[in-house]
């Protein structure tokens, strides 16, 4: 009968946590929804030291980034590292305290019972007890508002019907602080109820002995009715361990006395076994390895069975079937994840190398070059379905220059041959023109005048870009939306911009390129002379550009940026030279001069031109950019440089910026390949970074990355000044990944400014996550986060919290660090952060899990020393010996722990 007593199975709190007997007036009621007391040891120990939001912001940042990274540790995505978060043991103890006011005393379910001498002297003293766990038998919420006079212990042996009703009222499923007040109380003190009594509790000692059991009496019908459940309370039969299907519900058969008689227990168990065996057979037929085992038993071959890398089962018992089913589920999950990764890689590759196809030739008699421009809205919406992209063709800004030039040459050659063919034939008959006009002298003069007129008209037509003849075109150009929602650094967008503003022919013949270079040179000379002549009559301070001139200047700047950022699919030195020649038609500005320096370096480096001459030319354009930037306020309407680019031009020299390694990376960028993302010394890949908008910003970010790597390696042998890291931060584009890395380096290298540096790091990542929340497609291109960078950030935040005095929280965060096994993404930043964190946490780590992270981090540091190829042998030996000492100390500590 002891098992029939209603109870609630909850975990019991520690002995030190006593349940309050009376709620204070100003305290929150334990029955209120969500009132979970912070009784966990971690929360109580860190409550005084975690008043600042540093810990919460750090843990939230790690969880947000881990949810984006593939194969991230589950400890970061499923749990919070906040000191106020509950672990499993903390949650059990807290839920135990929370449910104690609603639950029956645990002593009713355990033998021997534990009664304190202060609250109960004998079993008869239950009536005067104030323990809410014992006085709550009537209603789960009535222990604070009313005093319940409970029966003695030997009166708990009630009839089976009453016990079943009480079990429904106080089962685990029905105890809910939001709904428990709706249930009526089961009044156990009704005097009309006559219960049969029996001794059900084994006496523990002399202080707690049950009274002699009374005689068994039979319940009258009236007593049964008085103890029944009210009709408003929904009655549900107690659930058995195995769930029955609707067809397997036990049948009720009327007995001889009219009372319902249940089906025999053996029949019910037989139905359970039959149903379970059928389900196991279905599971066996669904798993390939189990089907293969069944086929082998029948003597069939396994040629038609696709095991998918799984081994067939040897047995077909129930345990093997369940084990093989679990193995097959995990195999399918791994295969599904691998397929998702492959699909993502293929889609990224397709998006990167996608090139808009050329439009079909027009039916117009004129030779028109048409190019397909992908609508920005269609690209943003239907990016995944490439074949269904809506394409619109628009005519090129200029006619076919090469064909027009060749046609003019042929006409001139024909005229030259016609007038130059001086035959000695006589003139017979009369002619409409006077004879003196046909004299040799007159013919020579007319021929020379015609040649001069043709040349002048051709030059005027080419240099003015057909601006005077636009009104005579019969067919209007289709308007193309200038606004685009695509990323400015998208390779497709850059190619579209280059095709829109470039005058180059797609032919690769030498003659076409030569004529194109000649035309660009003439236009550049004409624009340069026009600007100089205008400057003679108007001072530079009073020079005002018209809207048309500004539009032409901006279009040309877009052309330069697009070609240097991979917009020209057939880029080579000659095509770069033609666009470089056309850049001289632009008014001088700091942006144009800096781009001309980049063009000069790319065109003439690693050629037959001496490197000294190339360096002088590059330095000339770079110094011109500095001069133009110093007086940039004169032409405020021209393009304004970003802050990082302006700092790069002002505070650096051309020889330092355009190193051989930098020139190689710029060539890779211009050729629109992904090799720059695989370069060992490149922290960011500007090809897919949507926040790097121009080649000058790419140059600044790569130069800052080189300076940061050099500074981090020098920090091992000398003390770094804070002005050096501030200079690097000033060269980084806003919200780019390089500025976040520079802020992490500042946080690690300068312990005295930990609080300010941590605020800057959290603010930088918050701004980046806000940008990602606006457009989900930019997560991979803006964050550029992976497991290695997540490890670097995790270690840096743990180190910062340790320096700020959050010892317990930092150790808890440190033990959840996932150290990557691969050495492919090791950078100087990850090496310095892991080395500093290792020296900080190795002396204070005590638990086995913390020591495991320390050991893995020591191995990571040793791997980084070999990967980065540190030139100083003494420094390398010192670092390796320190890692070995830490490892040997851990082995001693582990032995001490095991012996203890």
From Swiss-Prot:
Instruction: Indicate the segments forming the bHLH domain, all copies.
Output: 260-332
Against Gene3D superfamilies, the record matches this protein to: Helix-loop-helix DNA-binding domain (4.10.280.10)
Transmembrane regions: 443-463, 510-530
Q: Where is this region: Nuclear form of sre1?
A: 1-440
Hey, which stretches end up on the Cytoplasmic side?
A: 1-442, 531-900
Compartmental location: Endoplasmic reticulum membrane
A Gene Ontology biological process noted in the UniProt record is:
SREBP signaling pathway
At the top level, the lineage of the source is Eukaryota
SMART domains on file: HLH
Q: How is it modified after translation?
A: In low oxygen or sterol conditions, undergoes proteolytic cleavage by rhomboid-type protease rbd2 and is released as soluble transcription factor from the membrane. Processed form is phosphorylated.
Q: How does it sit in the membrane?
A: Multi-pass membrane protein
Which PROSITE patterns does this one have?
BHLH (PS50888)
Q: Which UniProt keywords apply?
A: Activator, DNA-binding, Endoplasmic reticulum, Lipid metabolism, Membrane, Nucleus, Phosphoprotein, Steroid metabolism, Transcription, Transcription regulation, Transmembrane, Transmembrane helix
Asked if the keyword Oxidoreductase belongs to this entry, the reply reads: no
* Lumenal topological domain: 464-509
Q: Which InterPro entries match?
A: bHLH_dom, HLH_DNA-bd_sf, Regulatory_TF_Diverse, Sre1_C
Region annotated Disordered sits at: 1-49, 206-263
What name does the UniProt record give this protein? Sterol regulatory element-binding protein 1
Provide the species name: Schizosaccharomyces pombe (strain 972 / ATCC 24843)
Upper taxonomic classification of the species? Eukaryota, Fungi, Dikarya, Ascomycota, Taphrinomycotina
- State the encoding gene: sre1
């Amino acid at each position: 009968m002891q098992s029939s007593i209603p109870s609630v199975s909850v975990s019991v709190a520690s002995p030190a946590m006593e349940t309050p007997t009376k709620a204070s007036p100003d305290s929150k009621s334990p029955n209120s929804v969500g009132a979970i007391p912070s009784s966990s040891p971690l929360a109580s120990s860190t409550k005084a030291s975690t008043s600042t939001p540093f810990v919460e912001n750090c843990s939230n940042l790690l969880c947000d980034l881990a949810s984006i990274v593939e194969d991230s540790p589950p400890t970061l995505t499923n749990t919070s590292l906040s000191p106020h978060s509950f672990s499993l043991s903390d949650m059990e103890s807290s839920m135990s305290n929370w449910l104690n006011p609603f639950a029956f005393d645990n002593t009713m379910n355990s033998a021997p019972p534990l009664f304190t001498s202060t609250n109960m002297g004998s079993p008869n003293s239950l009536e005067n007890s104030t323990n809410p766990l014992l006085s709550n038998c009537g209603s789960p919420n009535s222990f604070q508002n009313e005093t319940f006079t409970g029966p003695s212990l030997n009166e708990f042996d009630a009839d089976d019907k009453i016990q079943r009703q009480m079990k429904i009222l106080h089962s685990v499923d029905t105890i809910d602080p939001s709904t428990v007040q709706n249930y009526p109380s089961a009044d156990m003190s009704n005097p009309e109820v006559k219960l049969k009594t029996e001794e059900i509790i084994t006496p523990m000692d002399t202080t707690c002995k049950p009274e002699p059991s009374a005689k068994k009496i039979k319940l009258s019908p009236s007593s049964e009715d008085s103890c029944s459940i009210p009709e408003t309370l929904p009655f549900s039969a107690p659930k058995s361990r195995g769930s029955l299907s609707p067809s397997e519900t036990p049948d009720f058969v009327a007995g001889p006395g009219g009372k319902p008689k249940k089906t025999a227990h053996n029949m019910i168990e037989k139905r359970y076994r039959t149903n379970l065996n059928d389900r196991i057979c279905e599971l066996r037929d669904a798993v390939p390895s189990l089907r293969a085992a069944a086929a082998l038993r029948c003597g069939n071959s396994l040629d038609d069975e696709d095991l998918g890398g799984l081994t067939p089962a040897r047995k077909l018992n129930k345990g093997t079937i369940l084990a093989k089913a679990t193995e097959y589920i995990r195999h399918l999950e791994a295969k599904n994840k691998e397929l998702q990764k492959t699909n993502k890689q293929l889609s990224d590759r397709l998006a990167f190398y996608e090139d808009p196809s050329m439009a079909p030739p027009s039916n117009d008699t004129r030779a028109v070059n048409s190019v397909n421009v992908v609508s920005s809205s269609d690209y943003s919406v239907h990016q995944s379905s490439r074949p269904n992209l809506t394409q619109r063709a628009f005519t090129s800004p200029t006619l076919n220059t090469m064909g027009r030039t060749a046609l003019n040459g042929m006409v001139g050659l024909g005229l030259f041959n016609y007038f130059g063919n001086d035959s000695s034939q006589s003139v017979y008959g009369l002619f409409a023109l006077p004879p003196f006009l046909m004299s040799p002298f007159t013919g020579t003069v007319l021929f020379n005048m015609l040649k001069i007129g043709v040349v002048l008209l051709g030059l005027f037509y080419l240099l003015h870009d057909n601006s005077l003849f636009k009104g005579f075109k019969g067919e209007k150009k289709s308007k193309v939306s200038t606004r685009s929602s695509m990323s400015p650094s998208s390779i497709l967008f850059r190619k579209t911009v280059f095709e829109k503003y470039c005058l180059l022919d797609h032919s690769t013949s030498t003659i076409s390129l030569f004529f194109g270079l000649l035309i660009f040179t003439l236009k550049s000379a004409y624009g340069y002379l026009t600007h100089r002549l205008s400057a003679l009559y108007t001072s530079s301070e009073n020079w005002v550009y018209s809207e048309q001139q500004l539009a032409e200047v901006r279009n040309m700047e877009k052309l330069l940026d697009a070609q240097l950022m991979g917009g020209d699919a057939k880029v080579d030195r000659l095509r770069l030279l033609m666009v470089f020649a056309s850049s001289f038609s632009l008014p001088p500005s700091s942006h144009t001069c800096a781009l001309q320096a980049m063009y000069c370096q790319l065109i003439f480096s690693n050629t037959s031109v001496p490197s000294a001459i190339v360096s002088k030319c590059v330095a000339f354009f770079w110094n011109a950019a500095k001069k133009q930037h110093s007086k940039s306020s004169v032409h405020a309407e021209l393009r304004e440089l970003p802050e990082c680019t302006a700092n790069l031009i002002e505070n650096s020299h051309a020889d330092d910026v355009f190193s051989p390694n930098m020139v190689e990376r710029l060539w890779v960028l211009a050729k629109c390949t992904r090799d720059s993302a695989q370069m060992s010394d490149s922290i960011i890949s500007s090809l897919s970074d949507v926040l790097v908008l121009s080649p000058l910003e790419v140059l600044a970010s790569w130069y800052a990355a080189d300076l940061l790597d050099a500074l981090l390696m020098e920090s091992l042998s000398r003390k770094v000044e804070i002005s050096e890291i501030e200079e690097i931060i000033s060269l980084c584009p806003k919200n780019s990944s390089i500025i976040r890395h520079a802020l992490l380096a500042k946080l690690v290298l300068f312990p005295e400014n930990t609080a300010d540096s941590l605020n800057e790091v959290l603010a930088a990542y918050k701004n980046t996550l806000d940008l990602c929340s606006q457009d989900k497609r930019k997560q991979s291109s803006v964050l550029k986060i992976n497991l290695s960078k997540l490890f670097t950030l995790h270690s840096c935040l743990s180190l910062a919290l340790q320096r700020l005095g959050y010892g317990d929280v930092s150790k808890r965060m440190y033990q959840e660090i996932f150290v990557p096994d691969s050495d492919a993404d090791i950078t100087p930043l990850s090496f310095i952060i892991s080395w500093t964190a290792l020296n900080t946490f190795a002396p204070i780590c005590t638990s086995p899990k913390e020591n495991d992270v320390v050991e893995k981090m020591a191995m990571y540091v040793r791997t980084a020393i070999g990967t980065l190829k540190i030139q100083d042998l003494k420094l390398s030996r010192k670092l390796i010996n320190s890692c070995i000492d830490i490892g040997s100390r851990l082995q001693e500590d582990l032995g001490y722990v095991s012996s203890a």
